């Protein structure tokens, strides 16, 4: 079976003549099929050039006709233009056209009018479509590669049409273009459009959701001040772009490595037009690591462990609290329906393990993964981004707690304006901090110390100098000997904790303080 493709400029009289002859042949011949492509005068020339380049043809006028063997596949066979098709039809089928020039012109004018009307209708429909604009900043970074499929397949944002904006630096533009092509190749139905850019205001144009991947390669000890200034400058430019072009109800989720809390605080300070509760940082990486270790201990799926809380500075000192953690599906003495859960601390029933081996494994988890992979744990980061964004947009499982770094409004005596990781519950489009967590004195001291560190860290970010060069290195996690817990942050916490020693409690045994990847029992 042969299919003939006839393409032409809408106002071309010769296209009109060829089109009507092909219609006549199709009506008389069972295996003769016609497909038509009509382009406006503005569209025709670039479209024809691209078609010929793709197929290795040489043709410069309207119309162009080629033949495709649809039951065999392979490359189309170029027939040519008006005269070539007329000769082809006369030679093979004994048919020709006697259409006069005046009629050809009239039909061409009618074709042009109809084509323009169709284009206007398409444009009207396009304007009426209101996809969700999602931008990914630093999209050439590895975590984005794992997040994007979940964004466009409906897993995160459900059945929302998406206009995807990918941004990165000029040096990564070719990577962005490759990523754009690959996302197109996924053929997911909810992807309305996709664009790549190196311009931040363009990336944030009408954006409803933004994922900012903070994953800069650090230059090492000598470049600490330069790294700091680069980060702060970048976040100020991000804030400026959000103020200029983003939707006023945009949700901004920051993820990655480094001093995220302080950087998010700077971002909030410079986006006065955006509600500060609409900007947050991912805190679920450490939370998921703790859940995984607890699940392995209890021989359950890690999805069955919930309500692990990570307090504090996502990129620095954190307090990992499992005192309220619950486990579903545990094979214990008491069984119940899927909704039934038990206390993790009670089921582990081993404070020595919680205070020792658990903390050691949690301390080394990230390094162990990175050493095995020979690169950062991008899949873990992507999963944390995906679940956090999904919960924020759709709501989280009822009654469960999750960790999120947000701007404090005085929660748990953390000063207003400090970005801190708290336990939260998500509702559709919003979150709320859970404020009924019981705290002992040790925990209050630790959170107070972490708060002081965050205030100091933000000041270091904004005013880096040679005088505080060593402190800058610690903010970036650059140390001379990573096997030695030399962090001043950790020392400060331990000093303050020793001042208020108390009897061991299940709550204290089920918590951990972590400075980056250094973890000690509380």
Curated annotation (Swiss-Prot):
Q: Name one GO molecular function term.
A: L-malate dehydrogenase (NAD+) activity
**Keywords carried by this UniProt record:** NAD, Oxidoreductase, Tricarboxylic acid cycle
Any one biological process term the GO annotation gives: tricarboxylic acid cycle
Which Pfam families has this protein been placed in? Ldh_1_C
Show the segment(s) annotated as Disordered. 495-522
Q: What class of enzyme is it?
A: oxidoreductase
Database matches in InterPro entries: Lactate/malate_DH_C, Lactate_DH/Glyco_Ohase_4_C, Malate_DH_type2, NAD(P)-bd_dom_sf
| EC number(s) reported in the record | 1.1.1.-
Q: Which family does it belong to?
A: Belongs to the LDH/MDH superfamily. MDH type 2 family.
* Protein name per Swiss-Prot or TrEMBL: Putative malate dehydrogenase 1B
What's the name of its gene?
A: MDH1B
């Amino acid at each position: 079976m042969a299919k003939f493709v006839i393409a032409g400029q809408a106002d071309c009289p010769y296209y009109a003549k060829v089109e009507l002859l092909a219609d006549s042949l199709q009506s008389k011949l069972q295996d003769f099929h016609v497909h038509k492509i009509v382009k406006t005068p503005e569209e025709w020339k670039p479209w024809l050039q691209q078609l010929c380049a793709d197929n290795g043809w040489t043709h410069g006028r309207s119309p162009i006709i080629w033949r495709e063997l649809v039951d065999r596949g392979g490359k189309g066979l170029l027939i040519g233009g008006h005269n070539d098709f007329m000769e082809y039809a006369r030679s093979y089928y004994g048919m020709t056209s006697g259409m006069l020039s005046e009629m050809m012109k009239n039909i061409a004018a009618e074709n042009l009018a109809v084509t323009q009307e169709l284009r206007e209708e398409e444009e009207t429909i396009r304007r009426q479509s209101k996809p969700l604009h999602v931008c990914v900043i630093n999209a050439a970074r590895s975590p984005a590669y794992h997040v994007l499929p979940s964004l466009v397949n409906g897993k995160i944002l459900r059945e929302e049409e998406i206009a995807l904006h990918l941004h990165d630096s000029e040096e990564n533009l070719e990577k962005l273009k490759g990523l754009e092509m690959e996302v197109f190749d996924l053929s997911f139905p909810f992807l309305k459009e996709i664009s790549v850019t190196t311009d931040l205001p363009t990336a944030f144009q009408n954006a409803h959701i933004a994922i900012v991947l903070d994953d800069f390669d650090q230059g090492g000890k000598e470049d600490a001040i330069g790294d700091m200034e680069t980060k702060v400058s970048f976040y100020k430019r991000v804030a400026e772009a959000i103020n200029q072009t983003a939707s006023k109800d945009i949700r901004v989720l920051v993820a990655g490595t480094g001093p995220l809390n302080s950087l998010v605080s700077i971002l909030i300070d410079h986006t006065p037009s955006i509600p500060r509760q609409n900007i947050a940082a991912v805190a679920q990486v450490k939370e998921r690591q703790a859940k995984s270790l607890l699940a392995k201990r209890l021989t359950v799926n890690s999805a069955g462990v919930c309500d692990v809380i990570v307090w504090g500075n996502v990129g620095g000192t954190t307090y990992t609290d499992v005192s309220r953690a619950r486990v579903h599906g545990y094979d214990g003495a008491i069984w119940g329906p899927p909704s039934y859960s038990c206390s993790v601390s009670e089921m582990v029933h081993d404070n020595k393990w919680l205070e020792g081996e658990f903390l050691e494994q949690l301390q080394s988890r990230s390094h162990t993964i990175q050493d095995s992979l020979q690169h950062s744990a991008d899949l873990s980061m992507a999963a944390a981004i995906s679940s956090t964004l999904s919960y924020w947009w759709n709501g989280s499982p009822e009654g469960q707690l999750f960790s999120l770094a947000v701007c404090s409004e005085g929660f748990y005596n953390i000063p207003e304006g400090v970005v801190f990781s708290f336990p939260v519950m998500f509702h559709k489009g919003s979150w709320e901090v859970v404020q009924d967590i019981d705290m002992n004195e040790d925990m209050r001291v630790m959170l107070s110390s972490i708060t002081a560190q965050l205030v100091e860290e933000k000041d270091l970010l904004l005013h880096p100098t040679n005088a505080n060069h060593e402190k800058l290195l610690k903010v970036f996690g650059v140390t001379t000997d990573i096997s030695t817990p030399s962090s001043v942050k950790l020392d400060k916490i331990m000093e303050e904790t020793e001042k208020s020693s108390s009897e061991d409690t299940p709550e204290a045994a089920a918590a951990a303080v972590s400075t980056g990847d250094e973890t000690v029992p509380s």
